[in-house]
């Protein structure tokens, strides 16, 4: 029997460092992601 809904939790610090707003702004491709999310009208641009 397989249980579903349990996923590994990453620490908030690791999440922010990897995929936070400032991390996105550091790279060209990250800036493209932010621009794309702005165009789409996302309320949250980065987690």
UniProtKB/Swiss-Prot annotation:
GO biological process: translation
Location of the region described as Disordered in the Swiss-Prot/TrEMBL record: 1-47
Domain of life according to the entry: Bacteria
UniProt KW keywords: Ribonucleoprotein, Ribosomal protein
InterPro entries linked to this entry: Ribosomal_bL34
Record flagged with keyword DNA-binding: no
Extent of Basic residues compositional bias: 10-47
Gene3D superfamilies for the chain: 1.10.287.3980
A cellular component term, taken from the record's GO annotations: ribonucleoprotein complex
MF terms in GO: structural constituent of ribosome
Protein family according to the UniProt entry: Belongs to the bacterial ribosomal protein bL34 family.
HAMAP family: Ribosomal_bL34 (MF_00391)
Descriptive protein name: Large ribosomal subunit protein bL34
